[in-house]
Amino acid sequence: MSDLRRIIWLASYPKSGNTWMRSLLANYFMPPGQAPDINNLRRFTTADVRQDFFDKANSGPFSSPNVADWLRVRPKALALIAGSKPGTHFVKTHCQAVRYEGQDLIPPQLTAGAIYMLRNPFDLAPSFARHQSADIDTAIERMCNPDAMMGTDTGIRDALGRWDDHIRSWVEAPGLPRHVVRYEDMLTQAPQTVRGLLKFLSVEPNSAKLAKAIKATSFKNLKKQEEELGFTERPDGMKTFFAKGQAGVWRDELTAGQVARIREEFLPTLENWYPELLEETKDFAKAG
């Protein structure tokens, strides 16, 4: 039996830079002039919610409101995804790396490694709210819900859980080769950040290719693509997928109470990953 440990997961909570990362990697690795636009990223990466793979795994069109049916078909769909290319390849996921109802959502026997992207929850909350067509308080509730899920119209799901549990599930997964990238570091020090990622992939960085890939996938250019071409991955009801692409928007978009709630829920994880925000958010919450 052939070794199917071919998937390099591009994992994140929604609105944490996954599309940006997929675009950047496509622009770096694909031949000049052949990198796909944002609506054709599936030419370079796959996703674990692809309807065609679930249909094939189900031996017919997959559609079900039941989590049990999704769990029944998912392992077969992931095996098909893993075997769809001869070597290692990137697969997007928003699922936690956990056992769910006795099943590994990220099967070790199909996994070569993972790139995990995270974004500070203060900026994530308003962006996630737009993604969910919800108000910010509702988005924060979902970020705090251990049972939070998203799904396609046909019932192919993303098991999100809480924001902090999501991070923990990936960065503490036993035996998983992983590399963690902060959204904020991509904004402020992209060349250095991507070089670290490429070295994790055992790829010697090419400075010229890297500079071109970073320029081609700047937030301004991705937003321009969405304006000109639309974006097929944008959820119904969401006006724009690429809204601001900045760090620190929480200062203008969150109330003191919302900042306090996020701090209260996620403080240990903030201390680990965003210590630079602790004092400012503490003062902001008190000032309300």
Q: Where do the language-model regions lie?
A:
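PAPS-dependent sulfotransferase catalytic core
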Residues: I214-E264
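PAPS/PAP-binding and catalytic site of the sulfotransferase fold
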Residues: G17-P31, V181-P205, A213, N221
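Poly-acidic low-complexity segments
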Residues: A35-D37, N120, Q189, N206, ...
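PAPS-dependent sulfotransferase catalytic domain
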Residues: M1-V181, A243-G248, D252-G288
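Hydrophobic alpha-helical segments and their boundary regions
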Residues: R6, N206, R234-G237
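A residue-level detector for conformationally permissive "hinge/kink" positions
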Residues: W9, V194, G237-T240
